[in-house]
């Protein structure tokens, strides 16, 4: 299950989505996330799902690979669904002692589950279709106007990209440690939820040691290549919006317009 997490991973490809300017993809992802928290009806979520489905189809990333990334958050989805369905007051449709299910609770629980699923898939598509270096350059260019007030745009972009890339790396290390300890007789499967959580405590120390080792190796690699931050750094390919990028922006504007019109009508 740990290997199933797709957030932070890059899926190599030459699709139109892969070739888009990273700034366009970053802004589109941010607007998509904001839209998910604004929408409060099924039609709005349907529009968002169609938009995301079109992006996935054009990106040529296998749907099975994307859906696999939802497995690790199934427990969170179920917990959130149960919390909303039983804790929201309103028109009661079922009741047993202190437990009750309301129309408003069911509606909110379904909306929250859809929102989390679309949020995870949409966020994953950014890293799946964008090379780490391109992602760093895109974030830096978007933050570059703030350099005038002393904001270290390149350093912040580098830290954000490294943090994202560390997610699959740490998960892979966790999987290796779990398998190594299971080979030595450790049991992580038996017992209830609390016992399973306690059984995972012994992996924390080797995981932290491994994380610091990876970070040190990365720092030494950057030092050996004379990395000195963003000052006076040049690029082989300067970013410039092309026809495909403007087409993607137009598609994004149409999507946002549909959401705004739908929210006013319904």
Task: Give a label for each model feature.
Residues 69-77, 113, 117-120, 207, ...:
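Loop-to-transmembrane-helix entry motif
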Residues 51-61, 76-79:
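Alpha-helical transmembrane segments and their membrane-interface exit regions
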Residues 25, 64-74, 248:
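Alpha-helical transmembrane segments and their helix-start/interface "positive-inside/aromatic belt" motifs
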Residues 41-48, 65-68:
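Short, aromatic-rich membrane-interface segments at the entry and exit
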Residues 14, 37, 60-65, 96, ...:
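Membrane-helix interfacial "entry" motifs
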Residues 73-186:
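Juxtamembrane/interface alpha-helical elements of multi-pass membrane proteins
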Residues 1-42, 50-57, 141-151, 155-158, ...:
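Transmembrane alpha-helix interface motif
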């Amino acid at each position: 299950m740990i290997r199933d997490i797709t957030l932070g991973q890059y899926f190599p490809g030459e699709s139109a989505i892969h070739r888009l300017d990273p700034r366009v993809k970053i802004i589109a992802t941010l607007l998509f996330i904001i839209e998910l928290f604004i929408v409060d009806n099924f039609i709005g979520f349907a529009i968002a799902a169609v938009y995301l489905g079109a992006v996935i189809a054009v990106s040529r990333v296998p749907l099975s690979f994307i859906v696999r990334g939802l497995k690790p958050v199934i427990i969170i989805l179920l917990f959130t669904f149960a919390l909303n369905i039983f804790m929201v007051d309103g028109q009661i449709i079922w009741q047993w002692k202190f437990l009750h299910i309301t129309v408003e609770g069911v509606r909110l629980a379904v909306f929250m589950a859809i929102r989390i699923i679309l949020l995870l898939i949409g966020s994953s598509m950014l890293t799946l279709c964008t090379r780490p270096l391109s992602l760093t350059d895109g974030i830096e260019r978007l933050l570059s106007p703030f350099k005038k007030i002393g904001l270290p745009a390149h350093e912040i972009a580098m830290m954000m990209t490294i943090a994202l890339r560390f997610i699959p790396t740490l998960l892979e290390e966790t999987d290796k440690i779990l398998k190594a300890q299971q080979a030595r007789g450790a049991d992580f499967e038996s017992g209830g939820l609390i016992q399973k959580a306690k059984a995972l405590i012994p992996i924390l120390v080797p995981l932290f040691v491994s994380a610091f080792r990876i970070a040190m190796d990365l720092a030494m690699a950057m030092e050996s290549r004379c990395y000195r931050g963003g000052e006076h750094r040049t690029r082989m390919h300067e970013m410039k919006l092309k026809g495909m990028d403007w087409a993607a922006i137009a598609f994004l504007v149409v999507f946002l317009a549909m959401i705004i019109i739908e929210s006013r009508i319904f």
